[in-house]
Amino acid sequence: MPLPDFHVSEPFTLGIELEMQVVNPPGYDLSQDSSMLIDAVKNEITAGEVKHDITESMLELATDVCRDINQAAGQFSAMQKVVLQAAADHHLEICGGGTHPFQKWQRQEVCDNERYQRTLENFGYLIQQATVFGQHVHVGCASGDDAIYLLHGLSRFVPHFIALSAASPYMQGTDTRFASSRPNIFSAFPDNGPMPWVSNWQQFEALFRCLSYTTMIDSIKDLHWDIRPSPHFGTVEVRVMDTPLTLSHAVNMAGLIQATAHWLLTERPFKHQEKDYLLYKFNRFQACRYGLEGVITDPHTGDRRPLTEDTLRLLEKIAPSAHKMGASSAIEALHRQVVSGLNEAQLMRDFVADGGSLIGLVKKHCEIWAGD
């Protein structure tokens, strides 16, 4: 399929996607019933969309195009109410978190969807292993060249986004020792990590043509980069965050990305170059492994900075943009989180350290999501 022209969209508008876990009490393992829930709610959703993701234990909540985080929060709140009622009617529960702490990937059923079935054919068991749960945020751009500039700018802050959203310390019944283990699942994919370097939209079109020669890439949706342009929406899509445990934290993360995008495209503070990416995977690993306690390294100077310190610096820089975007409350909440030194991964570990079981942890996550 040829790459579509870049659709011009209103700059800095938002679209947010949350991949939720469908679980089956009292054992709180993943259920295989997302299709049933989608059928139950399809006539009840008035704004946004509830739809499939890769496997039948995943339920995606997606907003329409939103001006700001308050509009997005309202759409999510309405969808959440409908989905929770449908889940209760079918004796199911819903929760966030980047991974289910003890599910077995072999049990996961890939959705009966042409694209997902084709992906299963291409990638085999890797697709079942990709039963993990992330938050994706789209930001509107006025042109393809703006999208490429924004993608490179946001890529500088991938460690910050990962650390602030980290919520996947447990996988397959084991403490992984990572704050965010979810991104590791995609490490075997040939398109894992950052997008290959291009400096403008024309070069991106040439890159996509080259990738399509592999016959594994039919559309942008087949690319698993950390951040990717979405020409059919006219957006840049950030894909590195774990799904938070609460709707409020998900909205705050979207506000962070919107405000950062506004700062980047308004101030143009960086002259991007390929060397920017030399230590990308090392810095990304630090955030996944240690969360806010990680250390990032500047590929140009060799300077090493605590991620906590650098995140506070980012929040300060984007505060005026956050005010203009109506996202100041999000930046203030994230500032409090950084100062406290906590993320959701640590809260999960604290629950288990206090004697809680992994079953109890999922139950707690369902209560948190329903109560937010």
Swiss-Prot record:
InterPro entries attached to this UniProt entry: GCL_type2/YbdK_subfam, GCS2, Gln_synth/guanido_kin_cat_dom, YbdK
Nucleotide-binding keyword on record: yes
Disulphide-bridged cysteine pairs: none
Keywords: ATP-binding, Ligase, Nucleotide-binding
MF (Gene Ontology): ATP binding; glutamate-cysteine ligase activity
Enzyme Commission code: 6.3.2.2
PANTHER family on file: GLUTAMATE--CYSTEINE LIGASE 2-RELATED
Summary of the function given for this chain in its UniProt record: ATP-dependent carboxylate-amine ligase which exhibits weak glutamate--cysteine ligase activity.
Family: Belongs to the glutamate--cysteine ligase type 2 family. YbdK subfamily.
Identification of the protein by name: Putative glutamate--cysteine ligase 2
Species per Swiss-Prot/TrEMBL record: Escherichia coli (strain SE11)
Organism taxonomic ancestry: Bacteria, Pseudomonadati, Pseudomonadota, Gammaproteobacteria, Enterobacterales
